[in-house]
Amino acid sequence: MTLVTPLQFSTVQPNLYRGSYPREINLPFLRTLRLKYILSLTPEPLSTDPLMVKFCEENNIKTIHIKCQSERKADKTKPKIKRKKKTVPIEYDVVVRCVKFLIDKGHYPCYMHCTNGELIISLVVACMRKFSYWSTVSILNEFLVYNSSINIHERNFIENFNSEIEVDDLDIKDKVPWITVRYIARTATESKDELRVDDANASEKVARVSSVSNSLPKLKFHSM
């Protein structure tokens, strides 16, 4: 049997995959990934698709839906309605919700997708790369692998992502190793927050939050 990947399929990190909305021809391939979850960044959830519902039930795959607008081009045959045009198709809350879900190593293997595997997924992945200290050049180069160009609004969206994300009900030891090498935690002996940096090759480094670069996002764990 020939295995066909979804359009724009790629591995983001071990056991985390990205691509477009799965079609019937892609299901044998997705089955080989032994997925636990499918994360959909689409207008409608997979639960509205009988084919995908059956596939997920047969393979014990749970689905998560974060509603996003369609990436398809507007239908020029329809009458134009004057409204404020969004500069990018998602808000930062979509990225935050994705990070909160993907930080838990218990949610892997996971396939995340938008409608066509291009802009929305690329924006989310680009923002998440900042947790791994990717350079801006590397982030934008990866973005351009899946998109023919990047406009100023999309670039600003990526570069200005510096949210402090509250993480509840997850122990630090249960986070995936590739996301967040820098996190904020409240210590048991002090009332002030401290910034801690994970370093696999050295002892834990500690610095005050005031010294943190404002250009980087941070995670704040409450279960420590």
From Swiss-Prot:
It catalyses: O-phospho-L-tyrosyl-[protein] + H2O = L-tyrosyl-[protein] + phosphate. The active site is at residue 114. It comes from the Eukaryota. One of its GO terms (cellular component) is cytoplasm. It holds the Pfam family Y_phosphatase2. Residues 8-170 form the Tyrosine-protein phosphatase domain. It is found in: Cytoplasm. Its EC number is 3.1.3.48. The keyword NAD does not apply. Keywords: Cytoplasm, Hydrolase, Phosphoprotein, Protein phosphatase. It is an enzyme of class 3 (hydrolase). Its main location: cytoplasm. The keyword Phosphoprotein applies. GO terms for molecular function: phosphatase activity; protein tyrosine phosphatase activity. The modification Phosphothreonine is found at residue 2. Required for replication of Brome mosaic virus (BMV). Belongs to the protein-tyrosine phosphatase family. This is Putative tyrosine-protein phosphatase OCA6.
